[in-house]
């Protein structure tokens, strides 16, 4: 895989010690870091492996390959983690001992202005693709979706109460542009009158989150990865997942509690009881960053860490 030459800077790994403890690393074991990024977690895992140990690192972003570990115990997989099961089968792994997922968007993505993940600069194109070779970008969604579809997107993925008004304003604004909405600045202008100055950063973050989730099918990929993890882990293997917003955390919480990303409805629970989970939850409540880490690494502020062991 060809890697661009420019230097790549990623985030400091969040809750590194807690993740390593959660994985309960066997030096001779096989592990997967499905969100390789800058390689911070992976480097720490490899340091605990013997010459017999193995680590696979997944990342769909071409930039991540610049950080690949030059270690014979490590294999980089340039793919979306939704294909975890496919690649474990390809590499002949009949069971792994631990899987780590840090679901946060790296600071690298926000700092690379041309990727369009951040609203801090108005000039970039609205891209937001984690894999730049993948399908449609955020601009295509904003220009092609009707008001109803945009409203649903903002409501479900951004949890925005004014989703309908935002969608209507975007549709109205894009019709005034000969080339449609293309840049971050144009999107900001389209929604400016609907956002309270006091909550501007929070509401813009929710808008951009909703678009990013849609562009990359993040929740669909997460569901596939979780289901694959259950099949790939050996009995006694550990799943360690770090989430950064309520949509992800709810899916992970349900999956560990019920074995499915959607909780059973009340009627099913009343009639049949809760389904038996294939997981023993090591953390009944999610772990959060220490006061010191919050001070040293602001990115850890919204992180929630859940750990479970396959029964």
UniProtKB/Swiss-Prot annotation:
Keywords: Cytoplasm, Methyltransferase, rRNA processing, S-adenosyl-L-methionine, Transferase
Binding site for S-adenosyl-L-methionine: 39-41, 59, 87, 102, 109
GO molecular function: rRNA (cytosine-N4-)-methyltransferase activity
Listed Pfam families: Methyltransf_5
Main location: cytoplasm
Localisation per UniProt entry: Cytoplasm
GO BP: rRNA base methylation
A Gene Ontology cellular-component term: cytoplasm
Enzyme class: transferase
First and last residue of the signal peptide: none
Domain of life: Bacteria
Family statement: Belongs to the methyltransferase superfamily. RsmH family.
UniProt function note: Specifically methylates the N4 position of cytidine in position 1402 (C1402) of 16S rRNA.
Protein name per Swiss-Prot or TrEMBL: Ribosomal RNA small subunit methyltransferase H
Lineage, uppermost ranks: Bacteria, Pseudomonadati, Bacteroidota, Bacteroidia, Bacteroidales
Gene name, Swiss-Prot/TrEMBL: rsmH
